[in-house]
Regions:
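Acidic, proline/glycine-enriched N-terminal capping motif
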Residues: 1-143
């Protein structure tokens, strides 16, 4: 199955920890404020495509999973026509947030189920799976 997600792909990197004054509680927050909207966009794309999404009793892939993801990144004005997105965010951190969102949406039980992975970062109009705006094309195959 194929999902198309519109929105700015966001990396899930390190978390920041801090202690709330007057308490002994530590709080962890994402280092990027864009992670939550990106994960919500991925989850929404899955749920719009497949009504099973988000229900723990309705996991789509219970076995091994093949994943193919093409992220379309915004093209900087300074980028040449034949340029590739060789800058941040890191591809592996983009995949981390996207795989976690697919898990939350009920595509698979755990991102450890992903046994094969193809991933790319492109600019709009650069290739078959590029979108005209930032986002991602995600192909999932239950093996």
């Amino acid at each position: 199955m194929t999902f198309t997600v519109h929105g700015l792909p966001a990396p899930q990197g390190s978390k920041r920890a801090f202690v709330i004054k007057g308490t002994n509680r530590a709080v962890m927050t994402e280092s990027s404020k864009n992670v939550k909207p990106w994960r919500q966009a991925v989850e929404q794309a899955v749920m719009l495509s497949h009504p099973f999404g988000g229900r723990p009793d309705a996991i789509l892939c219970r076995g091994a999973v093949f994943l193919d993801v093409t992220f379309t990144m915004p093209r900087p004005k300074s980028a040449k026509a034949d340029a590739r997105p060789q800058t941040r965010p890191d591809l592996d951190k983009l995949l981390r947030s996207t795989k976690d969102a697919l898990k939350t949406a009920g595509v698979y039980e755990d991102d450890g189920r992903v046994v094969s992975l193809i991933a790319a970062k492109v600019y709009p109009g650069d290739g078959d799976d590029s979108l005209p705006v930032p986002g991602a094309v995600i192909r999932v195959e239950c093996v």
